[in-house]
Amino acid sequence: MEEITDGVNNMNLATDSQKKNRIQVSNTKKPLFFYVNLAKRYMQQYNDVELSALGMAIATVVTVTEILKNNGFAVEKKIMTSTVDIKDDARGRPVQKAKIEITLVKSEKFDELMAAANEEKEDAEAQVQN
């Protein structure tokens, strides 16, 4: 029984802060297509990506998701909404903020679309050099 307890105590749980495929989206720090391109890279590396946002940045996450879906790169796997308590710096009391987490997986055409996009980019660079 003691061995089981030691095993449970030594387990490494994947907490939210440890997820390698999570992108926390802000609507003020980076442009929209930064997140679109970052999500594509994460899907290439991990096969899926989790987009997460609070408050006003939720619209940005939804827009990034729709761009990836409409262009055939991704399929929705899971959408989760919740509220989180965040301390207001000015008043020191907790304020509730809306939170969304959208998990996207690579579409069947993902690799094909990425290869075509890379080919177009290389062609454009070759034309610039000539």
From Swiss-Prot:
InterPro entries (UniProt xref): Alba-like_dom_sf (IPR036882), DNA/RNA-bd_Alba-like (IPR002775), UCP030333_Alba (IPR014560)
Task: Give an example GO molecular function.
Answer: mRNA binding
Check the record and name the PANTHER family matching this protein.
Answer: ALBA DNA_RNA-BINDING PROTEIN (PTHR31947:SF43), DNA/RNA-BINDING PROTEIN ALBA 3 (PTHR31947)
* Key words, A-Z: Acetylation
Quaternary organization: Homotetramer.
Q: What is this protein called?
A: Uncharacterized protein At2g34160
A biological process (GO) of this protein is: rRNA processing
Q: Which organism is it from?
A: Arabidopsis thaliana (Mouse-ear cress)
SUPFAM superfamilies annotated for this entry? AlbA-like
The entry's cellular-component GO terms read:
endoplasmic reticulum; nucleus
List modified residues, type N-acetylmethionine.
1
What Gene3D superfamilies does its record include? Alba-like domain
Cross-referenced Pfam families, in alphabetical order?
Alba (PF01918)
Whether Transit peptide counts among this entry's keywords is no
